[in-house]
Structure formats: C-alpha cells, structure tokens
C-alpha cells in the first residue's frame, strides 16, 4: 500500500491542473474560429466548419473537435446489415478533399441537448445539400465537453437516412 501525504496530493493536483490548463490553452482555436460559449452553438459551428467547397481550409473543424476526437459513420444496408467507418478528423478532411471542388452545405434541421455540468450530448437531424439540392439527411449524435476556450466536440456519430431507417417525424422541421 502506498501512503501519500496531504502535501504530496496538493502538489500532484497542482501539477495535473497546470498540465490540463496548458493543454487546453495550447489547443485554443484562432480568433476566426471562436468556440461556442454554450452547447446550443455547436450545431451552427459544425455546419459552418463542414459546409463549403471540398478544398476549404478545415482549421475551424480541427479547432472545434478535441485532438483525439473520432467520427463514426454508421450505415444500415437494405438487408438490415449494420456497418460503420471510424475516422479521425484528419482522415475525414483527406476524404472530403478527395471530392474535388464540389460544394456541400450541411444544415441542422432540429436538435435536442442533454447537459450536465461541462458535458453535453446533442442529438441533431441534418440535411446535406449539393448545388442547392438535398442529397442526404440523417442524424448526428454529438458528444461535447467544455474546456477553457468554450465547447468542443469529442465525438460525432452519423447515420444517414435510408429506406430501412427513415428519419423519425420528431426530427423533421
């Protein structure tokens, strides 16, 4: 058994707090990519970061997500078979850039937030448009955390609507 004195605990706590504060400060986004001050601002921030031409600078997307964030894209086949693809933010950016100059716009349709202290879960329906035409819609499940700079996304799970999984009416505008 290890015995730790009160002074040692305070020293370890101060060291950890300093490391965490330094980590959060080092990851603060540029002024042009202000983080949302409340979780209600996350859907609009994501729409702005995702929308645009494929070769758009994705610095704001990287700033909005924590460094180790993951994006999971789930799908449901016509036969009911479930599959998924897990990506880092950098992998997502590379895949988007491969589209060429195609411009996409993501718009949140409706969202619901559950919040406790510095964590929040957002359940959001979206529509994806290309050249003004809707090409997809689905659900985003977004987990977020508040740090020194504002609210950031730790993970996003996405499932596009399909014939076997239509959007529920409560998530339509």
Spans of model-derived segments:
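Hydrophobic pocket/interface hotspot
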Residues: 61, 69, 122, 144
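Surface-exposed, charged secondary-structure patches
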Residues: 27, 70-71, 83-134
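Short, low-complexity N-terminal intrinsically disordered segments enriched in polar/charged residues
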Residues: 3, 22-64, 171-173
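Bacterial N-terminal signal peptides
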Residues: 6-19
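Acidic/histidine-rich, surface-exposed loop or edge segments in extracytoplasmic proteins
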Residues: 43, 69, 73-77
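A short, polar/proline- and glycine-enriched secondary-structure boundary/capping micro-motif
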Residues: 82-84, 132-136, 163-170
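Short beta-strand edge/turn micro-motifs at domain boundaries
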Residues: 121, 137-165
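A mature extracytoplasmic/lumenal domain signature
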Residues: 65, 75-77, 124-126, 140, ...
């Amino acid at each position: 058994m290890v015995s730790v004195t009160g002074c040692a605990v305070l020293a370890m706590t101060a060291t950890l707090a300093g490391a965490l504060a330094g980590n959060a400060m080092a990851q603060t986004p540029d002024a042009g990519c202000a983080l949302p001050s409340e979780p209600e601002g996350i859907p609009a921030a994501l729409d702005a970061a995702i929308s645009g031409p494929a070769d758009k600078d994705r610095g704001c997307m990287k700033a909005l997500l924590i460094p180790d964030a993951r994006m999971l894209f789930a799908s449901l086949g016509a036969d009911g078979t479930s599959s998924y693809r897990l990506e880092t933010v950098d992998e997502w950016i590379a895949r988007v850039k491969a589209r060429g100059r195609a411009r996409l716009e993501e718009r949140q349709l409706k969202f619901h937030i559950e919040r406790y202290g510095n964590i929040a879960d957002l359940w959001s329906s979206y529509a994806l448009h290309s050249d003004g035409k809707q090409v997809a819609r689905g659900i985003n499940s977004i987990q977020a955390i508040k740090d020194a700079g504002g609210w950031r996304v730790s993970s996003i799970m996405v499932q596009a609507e399909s014939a076997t999984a239509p959007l529920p009416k409560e998530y339509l505008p």
